[in-house]
């Protein structure tokens, strides 16, 4: 039907006859000559239709934005002075001699110009129109290129692309499962996989040795800018391998991907223990582009009369930390109030601060309502510890360590961006030596990653002191975003049972939920490990998009709905009956029916 894409004609095609197909991006009538900007996924070409071809000219008068047309004509150089150097095709135009309207179009719900700001709800409602925009189609093309590169890289390293089931059973992996009722097994449900975790481990038991999959995963959780109920991950697993080899392989893949696709030379990835990341940055995924760090000052304030600081300083689970912001004394009262409200989102009860006006004057050179409560000596000791200089501001967090880390860690990121403090464009890293477990509010332990992560100690040492055990887990972080996480897995049945016991999973429950895994561990399971990347998140970062919704063809909203298809939707009574399901109506629906009956 066509000989070339719209973005593919140039000066080498002058005097050639070509056929283009696409959407009319813009129509202009200039004194009896009609200009059409014709667009497809590869770009745009200018088509000229003049009265010398009366039939085509009559059709050109009828076309409007987003009409689908086919044009055959001769490529010619644009007249001097009318070239468009901003377009790859801007030196030439197509003199149309035969035009066919393939389909008319209703008026689009929004203009398709890149600079037009359109509400996301409208874009998602008409996603099939939104995806025609060059920036959107370019993101999909970019994603395809990234996926293709990853496949080729892993293929070349001996990995096999193996598909794992979508209909499986519910397993505790940290989020709620999406459940699928079984028609043939009354009262039973499949679950959509949160990850292929157990299946890829079983593939290692099966001798596959090196596996990968571009896998769809599903998690019924509250959504954020970088979360979707269904998402895509690059899933990797290998046998007879240690964490050093796995991290090296995946680092090589990401660095070579950035070089090939973006022509960016990423530096080698530094490694940082989890405890150090939390201590210095308040986060297990620190953004190393921002040169701000948290510093402990609890030992300096535990004896002061200021209970706001002294209380957390004496609490074994508390923390008092300072965040020095160079030149931050210029912040206005309103800005500080805004930051105070911001840290409140993370549970902080306030945001104490000290402005450093002139250190040579001692405590008199410090500006803050808390200096008098700390005492001059303590205030100056804090300034010395954090390396404060004239013109700085020092923020403080004093609370449970978890609250201080979250609040000051988030403030560090916000201030760094607000004050344009980023020192580089890309800052990758590995976070290693994660704890095996974390304590829940009720005092029980839960796995930080998942219960199949291998500890770095023996089963006996693990049982003796599980709260302080470290795991053989590792996370890849880029610009403060977790790109992927992985670990060496448990390949010994006794170790797996020991972990289950610590998590409060008894023998009967373990057998009911993971019997197939425990059986597999008895039949010669090799040492193995792996890692999974969030493909959506990776493409979001590489394209500079603000949300993964911008790099997914048909995403869900933050309330987990599809505005285009109106999913999720109700199903009819017949389908429910076949699935042996009866819906319990909400109180709101019952009240509505009562009101209708009264009428």
Curated annotation (Swiss-Prot):
Domain of life per record: Bacteria
Native source organism of the sequence: Marinobacter nauticus (strain ATCC 700491 / DSM 11845 / VT8)
Any one GO cellular component localisation term in the record: cytoplasm
Annotated site (Important for tRNA non-discrimination): 30, 81
Residues that, per the record, bind L-aspartate: 173, 219, 449, 489
Matching SUPFAM superfamilies: Class II aaRS and biotin synthetases, GAD domain-like, Nucleic acid-binding proteins
Lineage start: Bacteria, Pseudomonadati, Pseudomonadota, Gammaproteobacteria, Pseudomonadales
Function: Aspartyl-tRNA synthetase with relaxed tRNA specificity since it is able to aspartylate not only its cognate tRNA(Asp) but also tRNA(Asn). Reaction proceeds in two steps: L-aspartate is first activated by ATP to form Asp-AMP and then transferred to the acceptor end of tRNA(Asp/Asn).
Family: Belongs to the class-II aminoacyl-tRNA synthetase family. Type 1 subfamily.
Protein name: Aspartate--tRNA(Asp/Asn) ligase
Quaternary structure note: Homodimer.
Reaction equations catalysed: tRNA(Asx) + L-aspartate + ATP = L-aspartyl-tRNA(Asx) + AMP + diphosphate
């Amino acid at each position: 039907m066509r000989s070339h894409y719209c973005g593919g004609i140039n000066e080498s095609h002058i005097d050639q006859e070509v056929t283009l197909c696409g959407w009319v991006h813009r129509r202009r009538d200039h004194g009896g000559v009609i200009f059409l900007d014709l667009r497809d996924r590869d770009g745009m070409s200018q088509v000229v239709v003049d009265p010398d071809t009366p039939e085509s000219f009559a059709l050109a008068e009828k076309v409007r934005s987003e009409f689908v047309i086919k044009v055959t004509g001769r490529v010619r150089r644009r007249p001097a002075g009318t070239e468009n150097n901003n377009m790859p095709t801007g030196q030439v135009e197509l003199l149309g001699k035969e035009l066919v309207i393939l389909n008319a179009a209703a008026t689009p719900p929004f203009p398709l110009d890149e600079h037009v700001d359109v509400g996301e709800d409208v874009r998602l409602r008409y996603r099939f129109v939104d995806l025609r925009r060059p920036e959107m189609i370019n993101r999909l093309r970019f994603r395809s290129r990234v996926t293709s590169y990853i496949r080729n890289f892993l293929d070349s390293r001996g990995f096999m692309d193996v598909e794992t089931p979508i209909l499986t059973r519910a397993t505790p992996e940290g989020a709620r499962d999406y459940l699928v009722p079984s028609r043939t097994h009354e009262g039973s449900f499949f679950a959509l996989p949160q990850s292929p975790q157990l299946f890829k481990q079983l593939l290692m038991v099966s001798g596959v040795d090196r596996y990968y999959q571009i896998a769809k995963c599903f998690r019924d959780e509250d959504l954020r800018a970088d979360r979707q109920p269904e998402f895509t991950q690059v899933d990797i697993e290998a046998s007879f391998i240690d964490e050093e080899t796995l991290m090296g392989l995946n680092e090589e893949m990401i660095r070579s991907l950035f070089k090939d696709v973006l022509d960016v030379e990423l530096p080698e990835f530094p490694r940082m223990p989890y405890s150090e990341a939390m201590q210095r940055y308040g986060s297990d995924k620190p953004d190393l582009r921002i040169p701000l760090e948290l510093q402990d000052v609890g030992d300096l304030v535990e004896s002061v009369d200021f209970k706001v600081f002294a209380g957390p300083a004496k609490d074994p689970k508390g923390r008092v930390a300072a965040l020095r912001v160079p030149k931050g004394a210029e912040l206005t009262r309103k800005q500080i109030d805004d930051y105070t409200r911001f840290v409140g989102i993370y549970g902080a009860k306030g945001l104490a601060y000290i402005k450093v006006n002139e250190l040579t004057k001692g405590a008199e050179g410090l500006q803050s309502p808390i200096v008098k409560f700390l005492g001059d000596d303590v205030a100056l000791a804090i300034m010395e510890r954090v390396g404060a200089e004239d013109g700085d501001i020092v923020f403080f967090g004093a609370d449970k360590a978890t609250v201080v880390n979250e609040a000051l860690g988030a403030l560090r990121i916000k201030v760094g961006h607000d004050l344009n403090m980023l020192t580089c464009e890309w800052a990758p890293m590995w976070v290693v030596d994660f704890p095996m477990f974390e304590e829940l509010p009720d005092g029980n332990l839960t796995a930080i990653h998942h219960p199949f992560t291998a500890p770095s100690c023996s089963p006996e040492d693990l049982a003796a002191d599980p709260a302080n055990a470290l795991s053989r887990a590792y996370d890849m972080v880029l610009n403060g975003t977790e790109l992927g996480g992985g670990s060496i897995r448990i390949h010994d049945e006794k170790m797996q049972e020991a972990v289950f016991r610590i998590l409060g999973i008894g023998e009967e429950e373990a057998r009911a939920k993971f019997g197939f895994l425990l059986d597999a561990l008895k039949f010669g399971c090799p040492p193995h490990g792996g890692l999974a990347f969030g493909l959506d998140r990776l493409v979001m970062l590489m394209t500079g998009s603000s949300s993964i919704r911008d790099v997914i063809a048909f995403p869900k909203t933050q309330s987990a709905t599809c505005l285009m298809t109106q999913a999720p939707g109700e199903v009819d009574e017949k389908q429910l009956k076949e699935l042996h399901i009866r819906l319990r109506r909400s109180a709101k629906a019952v009240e509505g029916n009562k009101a209708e009956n009264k009428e």
